[in-house]
């Protein structure tokens, strides 16, 4: 949780740069900034131009108020930050980076201050509009990778603490794929537009008490299914034949550009879920086995 501070969010920002909200005209420079940082920091994944264009399309988190871009005297983007928050959510999420050549000058600290103040403002706005579950305590959640010690030092110095770890697991596809059969009455089908809404509802149900998860509305789900890297041909849904109810789903993506830099190609399972009433029937195992077969057939090295 973050305490109260009575200031405009932009007052937190470092005056070495000129600050403005991100817009369509900034897409190339914004993407180039993130790519420069990624070349040095080597994250597992980073946002590219198409991802940033999707961010600008959000109506739940309008870019004019929820993004900030810092440019130098030549107009080159050197730092950015953004937050997202669901209207009835109990937290905001913060994202950002500083050009490696401009780090160590207090710019990241200023961005963090901006994120915190925007989080306070978003919670206050939700409370003013009568959202019952917004909660009185503003909370900002940040993510970092283990090798990014400079980020850890910044966050810890500002009073943040580690609350959750995530692991990314890989499996070679050349060593054979396990067999996993669905029981009678269940059917595996392709994931297409006709199932988008049913899978959204199934996902919200499956993750309703999962740590840190919040329901996804139509806009948020649209960003999932229309993600620039989304691969519906590598995804699948399990249906209960008698009712047509979604019994499980596996939504996958493929980062062809990232594969070139990593030296191997992979199919990535972004979301895997089984609603409660269908658990314990081997559905997740069958979906993962199907995903590996799809990835292998597409010529990928790993899952």
What residues fall within each predicted segment?
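A generic N-terminal leader/anchor concept
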Residues: 1-29, 273
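A short beta-loop-alpha structural element at the N-terminal edge
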Residues: 18-30, 187-201
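Active-site beta-strand termini and strand-to-loop segments that position acidic
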Residues: 71-73, 171, 239-241
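Acyl-donor-binding surface of acyltransferase catalytic domains
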Residues: 1-11, 84-184
